[in-house]
């Protein structure tokens, strides 16, 4: 039972305990799971209404998963071009140019011939980010992008995401990285038992939480600078 809006160019961090519904909410936004009720309004139109083009809606959304979801039989470059050619109908040269630009952004351009099995977890996630960016999404969704990584690899992925800040891209990030959320988000949504318990700016939420539930949640974390 949630209701919120996202403005163009805004970075929204969704936080909460495990099982609070964070990932389910994200999957409902891009309709990997269909909501049982309610509305999802995109540019004034309800995407859940009959007749609305879901494939067209999904082209506006990029998603970065916990477990990378790269194609193991493809190299890094192919992972970043296949969707462009299949879904966006770009030719091979155009797709390659865009993929290389985005791989450069995430520091993975020199690994274009590597297969996923040859990469570390942090490198795989950076490739996944480049792949999502290569589809030119209006909104980029991150589902706990560091949760499957070894601790020493978390920083490189967070740094990559931080470098995307203020580029005009709209981002919704489900994360347990509290200091990261505090540093880069424009707004924080605290979810508990499938409901929005508190919502506000990072400064408001992290320094002066209004609800006891949010206070209890924050007391379980110690902050380190990202």
Model-derived features with residue positions:
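C-terminal boundary and immediately downstream tail of ABC-type ATPase nucleotide-binding domains
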Residues: 203-226
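ABC family nucleotide-binding domain
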Residues: 1-202
